[in-house]
Amino acid sequence: MCTLVLAWQVFADTPVAVAANRDEMVDRPSEPPQRIDDEPAVIAPRDSEAGGTWIGHNEHGLFVGITNRWTDAELAGDRSRGLLTRDALRKESAEEAARFVESAVRDHEFDGFNLVVADENAALLLEWDGQLAVRNFQPGVHVVVNVGADGDWRIPEERPEDGRQQGENAA
């Protein structure tokens, strides 16, 4: 289960605060957070297998984080979701990153994901299960897991027990 907790516009001096874990595949090799890009400067861990990342922050104040999304759809997933995250981190704002993701899902096949983009002005959730849904977050604390966000859970038929348990744990 991957979990991402976003506190957006909750703290006066910190418009974006995040806590996250990546524990679905604990044996997957990764490198610790480091500067992975210079234009703009991006700090993120690196997935040693596919070369992307699952979470990061850039010099413009843009945060991008992703969780896998469990779906019943058979998705081709020809491009790494971590590369999508890395590329979104090259944008200047959450709105620009969201537009980039909207374009990327038209051009490439991805496995299911929940992708959060946030800066001081906007916070959005982009949910991909073969179709893209975009949700604007309101100021507050938001919990994103493999089956959805903020109590809007979509439990896949292939993993009903895991999905229900994940929703209960995140509530």
Residue locations for each model-derived region?
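N-terminal nucleophile
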Residues: M1-A171
